[in-house]
Design a protein with these regions (language model features):
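A generic secondary-structure signal
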Residues: 61-64, 91, 155, 159-162, ...
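Anionic-ligand binding region
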Residues: 137-168
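Conserved Radical SAM active-site core
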Residues: 2-124, 132-134
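Short glycine-enriched, charge-decorated loop/helix-capping segments at active-site entrances
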Residues: 43-49, 138-143, 221-229
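Conserved radical SAM core fold
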Residues: 45, 82, 107-110, 128-146, ...
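Conserved glycine-rich "GG(E/T)P / GGGxP" loop and the immediately following alpha-helix
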Residues: 66-91, 138, 144, 154, ...
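Soluble or luminal CAZymes and related metallo-dependent hydrolases
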Residues: 54-57, 144, 148, 184-188, ...
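Auxiliary Fe-S-binding modules of radical SAM enzymes
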Residues: 1, 161-231
Length: 231
């Protein structure tokens, strides 16, 4: 089985405890489990960009990123390739891969895929996009987003436990939940953050992202999203 990869490189713009100074070894897989109307990586998420590679080549890419000094291997939207990625990680580890593995995903993840990856993943980096089913239906075609994301996050927490950092402040295991604030959706953001805090307290980290950038050609039907976040 082959996989479609859009990009593999040192990535300097993740959270500081992921990228550090050396960078995160990010592998961007084509395709995504959720269809957000505002996606800033639309061509990748829709599976339109990328190159077909073998499992063996993916294993080599992991090792090449390690050789370049990456702090970790960062699997971006990996769930739909979970069995193949697990095989590639087995191959790479047999050849000396020893970095923490990050699962960087939408939060709208099947437990089946997460279970396949869980033997390898040290750090879970899920999105938690919505509390409201109305918003998740309207903007991501996923009315059950909150329910699915809650189940996925609970599974991740059972696997990862409390966060651990090395002496350089780079996360080695644990969970960082990302939440992207959307224009006009501040109450929903408050509900998401309240839920996460009430459920997990200080057992997880929350990364609140305010860099929403409208992609105008995708948002002609959603004018309320076609501007940046105001202070």
């Amino acid at each position: 089985a082959d996989l479609k990869v859009a990009r593999a490189a040192l990535h300097m713009w993740e959270e500081p405890c992921i990228s550090g100074e050396a960078g995160s070894g990010a592998v961007f897989f084509s395709g995504c489990s959720v269809g957000c109307v505002f996606c800033q990586n639309h061509a990748i998420a829709a599976g339109q960009s990328g190159k077909r590679i073998s499992i063996e080549r993916l294993a080599d890419i992991f090792l090449e990123l390690q050789a370049k000094g990456a702090n970790n291997i960062n699997l971006v939207t990996p769930e739909h390739y979970a069995p193949s990625i697990a095989l590639a990680l087995d191959m790479a580890k047999a050849k000396g891969l020893h970095l923490p593995i990050i699962c960087n995903c939408s939060g709208y993840s099947s437990l089946t895929a997460l279970r396949i990856l869980s033997d390898h993943v040290n750090v879970w980096l899920p999105d938690f996009k919505y509390y409201s089913p109305e918003l998740s239906r309207k903007y991501s075609h996923a009315p059950d987003y909150f329910t699915v994301a809650c189940q996925a996050l609970q599974f991740m927490y059972e696997q990862a436990g409390d966060p651990v950092f090395d002496d350089s402040g780079i996360i080695q295991k644990g969970i960082i939940v990302r939440h992207l604030t959307l224009p006009g959706c501040m109450e929903d953001s408050r509900s998401v953050i309240h839920y996460l805090h009430e459920t997990y307290g200080d057992k997880i980290y929350i990364s609140i992202m305010n860099q929403f950038t409208p992609v105008s050609e995708l948002l002609s039907d959603y004018p309320e999203l076609n501007h940046t976040i105001s202070a």
